[in-house]
């Protein structure tokens, strides 16, 4: 895969996450019932960063959980008829909370749908909202993020690659060609 372009550097990522933090606080009139849930792998450090930015605004940090939806995905090969869920505990209570799912890139919407199914299995949230660092289009399901860092129209042959310090040792977003 060859890199076509760098679309976000470290400062652009920070600015987008700060804006998303402000939008979450504003839309929910504070963070009283807000819980952030990062979708592994890169959604988790993004959720933690957003929580830190929210704490600068509100004076306290919202709870942050993590969700591994690989066992819930409907588009995985079906080697097993029903995958076994080893652990459903995401580390935070979602009942009657405003759950903000955080992920790096939204594409078809299938990952988000699977994440919503997993959250609902854990309890009945007051609402589920979606924060994405990058929206690349090409949705296959009627899912739209509430908070978007950057809209990047892509072709289906392109890949958006988010790299974060916590996972990859660098902060940037690039477009690569398959």
Curated annotation (Swiss-Prot):
Keywords: Glycosyltransferase, RNA-binding, Transcription, Transcription regulation, Transcription termination, Transferase
Residues at which substrate binds: 41-42, 103-111, 136
Residue ranges annotated as motif PRPP-binding: 99-111
Molecular-function GO terms, alphabetical: RNA binding; uracil phosphoribosyltransferase activity
E.C. number: 2.4.2.9
Catalytic activity: UMP + diphosphate = 5-phospho-alpha-D-ribose 1-diphosphate + uracil
GO biological process: DNA-templated transcription termination
Database matches in InterPro entries: PRibTrfase_dom, PRTase-like, PyrR, PyrR_bifunctional
Role according to the record: Regulates transcriptional attenuation of the pyrimidine nucleotide (pyr) operon by binding in a uridine-dependent manner to specific sites on pyr mRNA. This disrupts an antiterminator hairpin in the RNA and favors formation of a downstream transcription terminator, leading to a reduced expression of downstream genes.
Family per record: Belongs to the purine/pyrimidine phosphoribosyltransferase family. PyrR subfamily.
Subunit annotation: Homodimer and homohexamer; in equilibrium.
Protein name, UniProt field: Bifunctional protein PyrR
Native source organism of the sequence: Caldanaerobacter subterraneus subsp. tengcongensis (strain DSM 15242 / JCM 11007 / NBRC 100824 / MB4)
């Amino acid at each position: 895969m060859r890199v076509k372009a760098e679309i976000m550097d470290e400062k652009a990522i920070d600015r987008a996450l700060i804006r998303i933090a402000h939008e979450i606080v504003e839309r929910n009139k504070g963070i009283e019932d807000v819980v952030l849930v990062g979708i592994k792998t890169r959604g988790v450090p993004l959720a933690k960063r957003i929580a830190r930015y929210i704490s600068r605004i509100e004076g306290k940090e919202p709870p942050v959980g993590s969700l591994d939806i690989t066992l819930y995905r409907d588009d995985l090969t079906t080697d097993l008829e029903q995958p076994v869920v080893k652990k459903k505990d995401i580390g935070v209570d979602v009942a009657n909370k405003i759950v903000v799912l955080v992920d790096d890139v939204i594409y078809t919407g299938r990952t988000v749908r699977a994440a919503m199914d997993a959250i609902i299995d854990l309890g009945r949230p007051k609402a589920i909202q979606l924060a994405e660092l990058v929206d690349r289009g090409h949705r296959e399901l009627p899912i739209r993020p509430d908070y978007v860092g950057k809209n990047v129209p892509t072709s289906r042959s392109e890949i958006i690659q988010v790299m974060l310090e916590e996972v990859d040792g660098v902060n940037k977003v690039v477009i690569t060609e398959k």
